[in-house]
Amino acid sequence: NLIQFKKMIKKMTGKEPVVSYAFYGCYCGSGGRGKPKDATDRCCFVHNCCYEKVTGCDPKWDDYTYSWKNGTIVCGGDDPCKKEVCECDKAAAICFRDNLKTYKKRYMTYPNILCSSKSEKC
């Protein structure tokens, strides 16, 4: 769920998730349209696509099982849908970490109105 996702992001990046990512670029936070502004925004685009593929549970609200082993997220549990959501969140948190060097403060609260180009397909 979103609370678990926030914890993953915080641990992976050291950044405060809501402040740093909830309104970043054209795809972080709710919805999304246009072309991703940079690699971090593309992480959100891919994460949104990942959530769209999930069926049988609610990615934003259903709890899943995960643990940390040697700084790595390990998704577990018996529910395949919830495990898939965990894998989506894990991939996004890793993507954010891997793109910290190109994170741009100017995209932190990017106005959605500027995301007007044609949306990419998943």
Swiss-Prot record:
Q: What InterPro entries has UniProt attached to this entry?
A: PLipase_A2, PLipase_A2_Asp_AS, PLipase_A2_dom, PLipase_A2_dom_sf, PLipase_A2_His_AS
List, in alphabetical order, the Gene Ontology terms for molecular function in this entry.
calcium ion binding; calcium-dependent phospholipase A2 activity; phospholipid binding
Q: What is the lineage of its organism?
A: Eukaryota, Metazoa, Chordata, Craniata, Vertebrata
- Say yes or no: keyword Disulfide bond present: yes
Please name the GO terms of the biological process aspect recorded for this protein, alphabetically: arachidonate secretion; lipid catabolic process; negative regulation of T cell proliferation; phospholipid metabolic process
Q: Record's family?
A: Belongs to the phospholipase A2 family. Group II subfamily. N49 sub-subfamily.
Instruction: Say if the entry is tagged with keyword Cytoplasm.
Output: no
Compartments, as annotated in UniProt: Secreted
* The species this protein was found in: Gloydius halys
PANTHER family for the chain: PHOSPHOLIPASE A2 FAMILY MEMBER, PHOSPHOLIPASE A2, MEMBRANE ASSOCIATED
| Disulfide bonds, paired cysteine numbers | 26-115, 28-44, 43-95, 49-122, 50-88, 57-81, 75-86
* Record keywords, A-Z: Disulfide bond, Secreted
Mind telling me what this protein is named? Basic phospholipase A2 homolog
Which residue ranges are recorded for the region named Important for membrane-damaging activities in eukaryotes and bacteria?
105-117
**Principal subcellular localization:** secreted
Q: Which SUPFAM superfamilies match?
A: Phospholipase A2, PLA2
Q: Which SMART domains match?
A: PA2c
Q: Which GO terms describe its cellular component?
A: extracellular region
Q: In which tissues is it expressed?
A: Expressed by the venom gland.
